[in-house]
């Protein structure tokens, strides 16, 4: 079975991936509840992580959108202990975003996943340059879903 964690986010990219995962018949293992404050969000995410222990089975696949504040490494470790594979889709790196993580901390955290999906060659190069040995795929896109009509380069 294929799973993802669809925690509501005001971030368009994360919402787009949730929509894409649903269209690909991935199951959302998030716990849906109204969040009134930070404490509620914290406990919802904690419950969601705990739920993965009971839901995941050997051979399953878990897609994690990154950054996944708190518990990212725990999710990967739970999946691995259950015989599951994890794919991490990186939207942004904490090393650049808030400068709370060093490059070494970020690479150590990402080393727990089985596969990484990045936006572009620059991000992939940066990760490799800083020691990331996890296999990676490159989307070469920035926006996932758009109402705009695509155009070919020769039409521009």
Q: Which residues fall in each region the model found?
A:
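Conserved donor-binding/catalytic core segment of Leloir-type glycosyltransferases
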Residues: 153-156
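A short, active-site helix/loop in glycosyltransferases that binds the activated sugar's phosphate group
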Residues: 98-101, 113-136
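Short beta-strand elements of ligand-binding domains
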Residues: 64-65, 87-92
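Alpha-helix capping/helix-boundary segments
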Residues: 69, 94, 122-124
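A short acidic, amphipathic alpha-helical/loop segment
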Residues: 73-78, 101, 105-109, 126, ...
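N-terminal pre-catalytic "stem/leader" segment of glycosyltransferase-like enzymes
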Residues: 1-70, 74, 82
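Short beta-strand->alpha-helix junction loop in the catalytic core
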Residues: 138-150
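Membrane-proximal helix-turn-helix segments that form the acceptor-binding/catalytic region
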Residues: 50-57, 78-85, 95-116
